[in-house]
A protein has these predicted regions:
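Conserved N-terminal catalytic core of the sugar/cofactor nucleotidyltransferase
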Residues: 1, 9-16, 24-117
């Protein structure tokens, strides 16, 4: 799960050190938390969350709030999507060389979680 970004697209809700995926939407949970909930259950393995240093504590706290166990991997330096995906792929290959990965942004709104899981 890609959990980076600088938080500049949804200003003033998001800011440099508070990216939009961590901001509660419409009085509910943050999109990051919604994404973690969609990954709960037997169809998905423990998520690998790739985050920048600025959001590492927020990601860990919000994962704990929804009871999600994650492998939090910090980007040594923000290098956009491909580098984050490559980092997650290396971690996944170390976990299980035969695993199939699913790349997810942490800020998408998907109202039908059942359809997503299918």
């Amino acid at each position: 799960m890609l959990c980076g970004g600088s938080g500049t697209r949804l200003w003033p809700v998001s800011r440099k050190d508070f990216a939009k995926q961590h901001a509660p939407v419409l009085g509910g949970e943050a999109p990051f938390q919604d994404t973690l909930r969609r990954l709960a259950g037997p169809a998905f393995a423990r998520p690998i969350v790739v985050a920048g240093a600025a959001s590492r504590f927020m990601a860990a706290d919000q994962a704990a709030e929804v009871g999600a166990a994650v492998d939090l991997v910090l980007e040594p330096e923000g290098r956009d999507t491909l580098a984050a995906v490559a980092l997650a792929a290396l971690v996944l290959a170390g976990r299980d060389p035969e695993a199939i990965g699913l790349v997810l942004p942490s800020d998408h709104m998907i109202p039908d979680a059942e359809a997503f899981a299918e």
